[in-house]
Amino acid sequence: MKKFLLLSLMSLASSTVFAASSTNTIGIVNLRRCLEESELGKKESAEFEKMKNQFSNSIGKMEEELSSIYSKLQDDDYMEGLSESAAAELRKKFEELSSEYNTAQGQYYQILNQNNLKRMQKIMEAVKKASEVVRIQEGLSALLNEDIVLAIDTSSDKTDAVIKILDDSFQNN
């Protein structure tokens, strides 16, 4: 019985030592920082902002024209000075421009959403590749998105290493 107890204790002790020596290490990556601080993320964000500004400028011109026509339609003195056909034409122009504006705005949002999705997919793919390199270099078993981790030691944050690899890859392309 003593031998069995001694063997059980030795077995338990050795399995604990083995488990401690083969502990899987986990790191985290802050995706928001990768998007905001990496060269790729900055480039993609700048291109997205440029596209938004171009759309805003073209929509802005339509808004100005709509506003001008609307002001004329609301000005009783102006409308009384027009012939019935000219007033009807102005109303028709306002309706057509309103419809065109609504269509353009819908297309604008659809294009922006599609572009943003493609941009995020491109960046996420690059972050995944960079994360795999960091995981291998640092001998980690996994790198997780910081948002899904409730608590972890700050030394597990590998975001800077991932950003460095993203920047190196961006400069080489």
Swiss-Prot record:
Tell me the GO molecular function terms: unfolded protein binding
Q: Which SUPFAM superfamilies match?
A: OmpH-like (SSF111384)
| Transmembrane segments annotated in the record for this chain | none
Is Transferase one of the keywords? no
Q: Which GO terms describe its biological process?
A: chaperone-mediated protein folding; protein stabilization
An example of a Gene Ontology cellular component annotation for this protein is:
cytosol
Family annotation (InterPro entries) = Chaperone_Skp (IPR005632), Skp_dom_sf (IPR024930)
What does the UniProt keyword field contain? Signal
Q: Does the keyword Signal apply?
A: yes
Q: Which domain of life is it from?
A: Bacteria
Q: From the UniProt annotation, give the residues forming the signal peptide.
A: 1-19
Concerning its family, UniProt says:
Belongs to the Skp family.
Q: Read off the PANTHER family from this record.
A: CHAPERONE PROTEIN SKP
Protein's name in the database = Skp-like protein
Q: Which species is listed as the source?
A: Chlamydia muridarum (strain MoPn / Nigg)
